């Protein structure tokens, strides 16, 4: 895969340039564009993933299915599709926005800062997973209600962005729609 970049943003969310992804995530991370995606299977279960230990930010932490950064000229939806193929080896339905105006800043235990405008999407797959071990060290298909209960009871056990997304009432409602079988 070619070197990925992040799209830098000003305080109003307007693009101002790009920076190599690995260089972007530091103790002084600039605001940039990202996305977060929650993936559901044909049984209506959510894919929860554990980030690989080699990840720069939040290694080994349980999180929602896929996160990443759109590249210059790439739509958020196309970026979700690309990262689902790369990290999970799956094809997905068209990603649907569930929390389009999500924005957050969080610092991991190693001092790495995430500072992102991060629209949240949900999608479905019927493909068998082909996990990229450089990205994901473990995974589990779970009932959304169980995951949400776990987040409410033990938020420290999940990535901060997943917790923030899951505790938004409207996002929960939209995610719950993906548990309904089609």
From Swiss-Prot:
User: Which residues carry out catalysis?
Assistant: 67, 116
**Any one GO molecular function term:** isopentenyl-diphosphate delta-isomerase activity
| Binding residues for Mn(2+) | 25, 32, 69, 114, 116
Keywords (alphabetical) are: Cytoplasm, Isomerase, Isoprene biosynthesis, Magnesium, Manganese, Metal-binding
Reactions accelerated catalytically: isopentenyl diphosphate = dimethylallyl diphosphate
- Asked if the Swiss-Prot or TrEMBL record annotates the protein with the keyword Magnesium, the reply is yes
Pathway the protein contributes to: Isoprenoid biosynthesis; dimethylallyl diphosphate biosynthesis; dimethylallyl diphosphate from isopentenyl diphosphate: step 1/1
Query: Could you tell me which SUPFAM superfamilies the record lists for this protein?
Result: Nudix
An example Gene Ontology CC term for this record: cytoplasm
Q: How is the cofactor bound?
A: Binds 1 Mg(2+) ion per subunit. The magnesium ion binds only when substrate is bound. Binds 1 Mn(2+) ion per subunit.
Q: Which InterPro entries match?
A: Idi_bact, IsopentenylPP_isomerase_typ1, NUDIX_hydrolase-like_dom_sf, NUDIX_hydrolase_dom
Q: Which domain of life is it from?
A: Bacteria
All copies of domain Nudix hydrolase, residue ranges: 30-164
Looking up CDD domains in the UniProt record yields: NUDIX_IPP_Isomerase
Q: How does it assemble?
A: Homodimer.
Name under which the protein is recorded: Isopentenyl-diphosphate Delta-isomerase
């Amino acid at each position: 895969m070619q070197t990925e970049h992040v799209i830098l943003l000003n305080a109003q969310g307007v693009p101002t340039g790009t920076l190599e992804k690995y260089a972007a995530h530091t103790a002084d991370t600039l605001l940039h564009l990202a996305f977060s995606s929650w993936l559901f299977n044909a049984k209506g279960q959510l894919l929860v993933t554990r980030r690989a230990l080699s990840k720069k930010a939040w290694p080994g932490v349980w999180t929602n299915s896929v996160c990443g950064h759109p590249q210059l000229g790439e739509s958020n939806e196309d970026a979700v599709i690309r990262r689902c193929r790369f990290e999970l080896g799956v094809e997905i339905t068209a990603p649907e926005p569930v929390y389009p105006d999500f924005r957050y800043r969080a610092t991991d235990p190693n001092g790495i800062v995430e500072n992102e405008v991060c629209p949240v999407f949900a999608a479905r797959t019927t493909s068998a997973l082909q996990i990229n071990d450089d990205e994901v060290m473990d995974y589990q298909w779970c009932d959304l209600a169980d995951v949400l209960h776990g987040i409410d009871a033990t938020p420290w056990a999940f990535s901060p962005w997943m917790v923030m997304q899951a505790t938004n009432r409207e996002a929960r409602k939209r995610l719950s729609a993906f548990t309904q079988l089609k």
